[in-house]
Amino acid sequence: MRTPTTILLLVGAILFSGAGYVRSDASDHRYKEGDTVPLYANKVGPFHNPSETYRYFDLPFCIPEGVKEKKEALGEVLNGDRLVSAPYKLNFRDEKESEVYCNKKLSKEEVKQFRKAVEKDYYFQMYYDDLPIWGFIGKVDKDIKSDPSEFKYFLYKHIQFEILYNKDRVIEISARMDPHSLVDLTEDKEVDAEFMYTVKWKETETPFEKRMEKYSMSSSLPHHLEIHWFSIINSCVTVLLLTGFLATILMRVLKNDFMKYAQDEEAADDQEETGWKYIHGDVFRFPTHNSLFAASLGSGTQLFTLTIFIFMLALVGVFYPYNRGALFTALVVIYALTSGIAGYTSASFYCQLEGKSWVRNLLLTGCLFCGPLFLTFCFLNTVAITYTATAALPFGTIVVIVLIWTLVTSPLLVLGGIAGKNSKAEFQAPCRTTKYPREIPPLPWYRSAIPQMAMAGFLPFSAIYIELYYIFASVWGHRIYTIYSILFIVFIILIIVTAFITVALTYFQLAAEDHQWWWRSFLCGGSTGLFIYAYCLYYYYARSDMSGFMQTSFFFGYMACICYGFFLMLGTVGFRAALLFVRHIYRSIKCE
């Protein structure tokens, strides 16, 4: 058991040694009056389609001379960031009033392109000294008219920057579009446009260390916190009711069972051969498709470990707002470093299940989650390339990811598998397994797999569904989510409810003399992932304004992968809890 512990300690040391580096990634530059402060234009895109973003100069803005692309980290590229030097000169404490930076005659095609962008509510994003700036590129004047052909389309041509500074550091920046300085795009004709900008500087007492707090305050407002705490209380009540109910029922039932089975020598044959003790010779019979089962446990354990490490980094403040690409970088690195845990767990359990083809099992473990994720990525990346969107990964980034998988993930997976194979641990079964399996008696329909999965998934989902909206609005929208402590509490509640409901359903399954509980407990535990995917359908059609083939395919494609990951992770939690329970109750009776 030292191997997985060693791997966990190693991963933790690497991550927390790098945590300080990630946090200091925000610019700590000091400037003198007149110094150049880096300003990068990032991307543009429809406001309601967060995945459908394009390079800033894909729209026919004035392109300055010597445009330079910023060298980006892996996480920034995965996040769809494509930073280039912006056309504005915002030197430190250098004020400007209606400075013209470009005069341009827009052709008919450029007018059409801008009008289409304005119609779709295109916004732009920039970074000034690593502080984000947003704004819409234009507006639609509907003037209480219902006929879209009568709408008027305007392009903003004057942007007003207001920058706050504290001594020699930039603290805050905001951009406001001048509503009176517009270019009419309604008709298909050439238009003269004079683009200009204004810069105002104001001093503030806000320290540099707190300049990012502005972006996390929205999620910490009292009315938002009330909803979050209502979610926590709702979840806690669910947990208390569930655990109390199950504990009462199971303890009472098990107590009666133990008393009955303790007197089995005096009881009649028809009384002693009933219930879950009747199948003690079959309950530890290994499941079918043992290689797939072990691989699922290995992948689920890895994803559970990955989630814990992500929460640890979030709670120490690594994922502060607009730390570009930090989450994606952490996901890639931690997944690669924890692959040894998947290999060890899968191979050791597979050998306990008396499996012989451990190499094939290891290959299955490596592909079980990465395979569907890779196929989904290939399809969605092709869609993004077709749209020329920034979500399309460059060839170099794909090569880097393949190298990480080849040089880090795969070797660690193999090393973990070898360690698991050589652990020589035997499966601890309190009862001997008979040579031939008993026939399972006919069961009512509600004891079959699908109704049981529906019952098992509903309760854990009900404990997290309120928090899901805020997570979705952050991942697939423009909300900022920073209350990671509450999210971690919800995650712990999710794990507890999943474990308890799986244990209860496993007991009722065994009491009905159905000994095929291995896969059933895994499926019941993981069924919450199916409920989350069903919530995706509801969120897309009822709570969001997403549209278009690209955004739709990205949303449902990547959410399918995330829900599949939840299925594997929670399935592992459910099975582990059920295994502990089954071992406990059969260890408490005398098995022949």
UniProtKB/Swiss-Prot annotation:
A motif (Golgi retention signal) lies at residues 590-592. A motif (Endoplasmic reticulum export signal) lies at residues 581-586. It comes from the Eukaryota. Residues 25-229, 324, 384-397, 474-485, 543-553 are lumenal. GO terms for cellular component: endosome; endosome membrane; extracellular region; Golgi apparatus; Golgi membrane; Golgi trans cisterna; trans-Golgi network. The keyword Zinc does not apply. This is Transmembrane 9 superfamily member 2. It comes from Arabidopsis thaliana.
